[in-house]
Amino acid sequence: MACNILNFLTGLLSLSSTLPSTYFPSCIKPSNSHVSQNPVRFEVHLTPGRANPTGAGFRDVILVNGTFTGPTLRLSRGDNVEFLVRNHLREDTAVHFHGITQSLSPWADGTPGIAQRPIRPGAAYLYRWRADESGVFFYHAHSRGQLMDGMYGAIVIERGEDEPSPFHMISHEASDWELMREAEREVQTLMISDWSQFSFGEVMGVEREANIDFTCMDAIVVNGAGSEYCLERELLNEYTNPLVKFILSHTDEKEITDKGCVPPLRLFQGNYSLHLDTLPPEAFRKCIPGVGGGANHTVTVHSSNRWAALTFINPGGLYPLKVTIDNHPMHVFAVDGHYIYPQIVDQILVNNGERYSVFVKLDQEVGRYTIRIANDLLGQVLGGFAALSYNGVMDDPPHPKPLMNYAGGSLVKNIRVFDEFNTRPYPPKPPASVADRTHKFMVRKLAQPHGAYEWTMSGIEGLNMTTEDVASPFLFQDPSQIETSELMLTTKKNEWVDLIIEVEGPFAQSHPMHKHGNKAFIVGRGVGFFPWATVEEAEKHLPRGTFNFIDPPYKDTFKTLEGVNNNAWLALRYHANSPGAWLFHCHIQTHLAGGMGVVILDGVDEWPELPEAYAEWNGFEAPV
C-alpha cells in the first residue's frame, strides 16, 4: 500500500523496540536498485541502558537488541547484506563495519559527515553492502566515542571452498586439515576490551574540566564480562615498569595510583595548564573492587574436535592487549580477516581494531584453562581473565602453566611473541614496487591554547567532531568543489598511494591507525625522523631491509612504533581502487575525538554516483 511522505517520516520517528526482527513498515521499501535480490537481513535496535559487567557499579551503556555486547552476524562470502539500524537513543549515531571495504557501497561505511548523515534519534537507516571478503570483522558505533559505551559486535564471514588455506603449514596430517576447516567454520569470537566506569561523554567531560588526556581504565572485559581487580600496594609496585619507576622517582608522586595508573602529571600530559583539582577520585586513583558482577567469560571447546578456532577482537577505547592461554600455544592463521603464513606463538598483542584468528590444539588434560589478558602500555598495570573449558568442565587442571602475569610480564623464558611486522599474507600478495602518490602525516598533540586532549595528524590542526554534523557529507558532494587541505586529501583511481605517519617524540606513543575503504601493506617502519618526501628517497639513506615490497603485512589496522627520546614512523602502501570519501584515523577513541583523523577522497576522477535512496531517504526507496 502506498504511503505519503508524512506517514513515512512518522513511521521512522516512532519505531518500537518490540517490533519483530523481520519487520519492515509497509511504507518503508528496501531499495534493490543497487544490490541483487535475496539479501541477508539483520535488524538492530540501539537503546540506552545500564550495565555492571565488572561488579564495580552500573553505568550508562548502549544496548544492541537489548544486550552488551551486540549479537554476532554470521554470513557467507558473496552474501548481500541489509543491516537495518533503529536508533532509540537520545543522540545521533552511525554504524561502521570495521574491515569491510565497501568497494561498491561507500555510502554504507558508517562515517557521519563523510559517507552519510547521522542517524537521528528515533530514525532508522538501512545499510546495504556485499560480503566480498571472508574472515572475521566487527561492527561498531562511529559517532562521538559511542564505541566505548558498548556498541559493538562481531561479524564472521565464512570462507568459500575455493579459497586456499595455509593449514598444511600447521599440521602435516591431512586429517587435521578438515578438522581445522570445520573449527574455522565454528570460530568463537572473543571481544577483548578495556572498560571504564565512566561513559564516553563523562570521559570527555573529565578531559575538558581537568584539561588532561584521559589515560586510566577500570577493567578488561571479554564479550561484556569481567571484573575490576584492586591489587595490594606490594603487587602494584612489583608490577610497575622499571622506566615508569625511574621517572616517578623524580616526581612528588613516587608510585602509581591504587588503580595502577601513572598519575596525570604534566611530565606525561605535556606543557599545559592542568586543573587536576577537578578530577573525580575514581578517574585515576580510587579503585573499586568488583563485587557481584558477571563472571568472567568462558569459552567451551570439545576435546573430540582436536582443534578449536578463536578470534580475538579488540574494540576497546584505549589499550592494546596482550593475550596468552595457559598450557596452550596458539597457531595464528589470519590477521584482520586475511590468511597469513602461520606463526606458532605463546602470546599475541591485539591492538585497537585488530582481529587475530588462532587455532588451539586440544591436546591437554580436561579442565578449565585461564586466558590471560593484559594492557601493553606503560601507563597502567591492568589485567583481566577469561577461561577455556574442555567439555564444559570447570575444574582447574592439575598442572597449570601460566605464561604471563597480571601486568603482562613473561613467566617463562624465551616466550614466543607474535611478530606483526614479519606477517606475510597467504597466498603471497605483493604491493606495487613504486607509489604514484605520497601523503605524509605528523601525529602530535596540539600546543596551547589547545587542550591537552587535542591531537592532530597534519601537525597543524585536528579533524573536529563537528565534521559529523555537516549538512552535506563529503561523499554526497562533487569532489572538485571540496577544498583540499592537510585534513582533506585526494587520490585518483587505481593509483598506488603511500601514507607515511610520523609520530612526534620525545615519548612517541604507539597509535592504532585504521584506513576505511582499503587494506594496506606495511612496507616500512622505523624509529627516528622521516625527513624524506617519499619512500623511494628514503630507501637511498636507510639500511637495506628497512622496506619490504615482496611480502609485507597486509592489514586494515596498523600500529605505529613507540619511540623513547625520539620520533617514530610507519609507511603504508595501498591501491586506491575504491572511489569514495574515507576516514583515516587513530582507533583510540579519545584521540579520534580529539582530532586525530583525516579524510581521503579516493578516486576523485571516477567518483561514485550516489543512489537516491541514500541521498534522501537513509537507504530506503522514496515514498510514493
From Swiss-Prot:
Residue sites binding Cu cation 4 per the record: H511, C586, H591
**Enzyme Commission no:** 1.-.-.-
Q: What is this protein called?
A: Multicopper oxidase elcG
Q: Which residues bind Cu cation 2?
A: H98, H140, H587
| MF annotations from Gene Ontology | copper ion binding; oxidoreductase activity
List glycan-bearing residues: N65, N271, N296, N464
Q: Which residues form the Plastocyanin-like domain?
A: 48-160, 216-373, 474-603
* PANTHER family, per the entry: LACCASE-RELATED, MULTI-COPPER OXIDASE
Q: What are the UniProt keywords, alphabetically?
A: Copper, Glycoprotein, Metal-binding, Oxidoreductase, Repeat, Signal
Q: What role is this protein assigned?
A: Multicopper oxidase; part of the gene cluster that mediates the biosynthesis of elsinochrome C, a perelyenequinone phytotoxin structurally similar to cercosporin. The first step of elsinochrome C biosynthesis is performed by the polyketide synthase elcA which catalyzes the formation of nor-toralactone.
| Organism this protein belongs to | Phaeosphaeria nodorum (strain SN15 / ATCC MYA-4574 / FGSC 10173) (Glume blotch fungus)
Q: Does the keyword Oxidoreductase apply?
A: yes
Q: What sort of enzyme, by top EC class, is this? A: oxidoreductase
Q: In which pathway does it act?
A: Secondary metabolite biosynthesis
Q: Which domain of life is it from?
A: Eukaryota
Query: Which Pfam family, giving just one, matches this sequence?
Result: Cu-oxidase_2
User: Which residues does Cu cation 3 bind?
Assistant: H142, H516, H585
Using the record, list the residue span of the signal peptide; answer none if the entry has no such feature: 1-18
Q: Which InterPro entries match?
A: Cu-oxidase-like_N (IPR011707), Cu-oxidase_2nd (IPR001117), Cu-oxidase_C (IPR011706), Cu-oxidase_fam (IPR045087), Cu_oxidase_CS (IPR033138), Cu_oxidase_Cu_BS (IPR002355), Cupredoxin (IPR008972)
Q: Record-annotated residues binding Cu cation 1? A: H96, H514
The UniProt record describes its induction as: Expression is up-regulated during the late stage of P.nodorum wheat leaf infection and is controlled by the cluster specific transporter elcR.
Q: Which family does it belong to?
A: Belongs to the multicopper oxidase family.
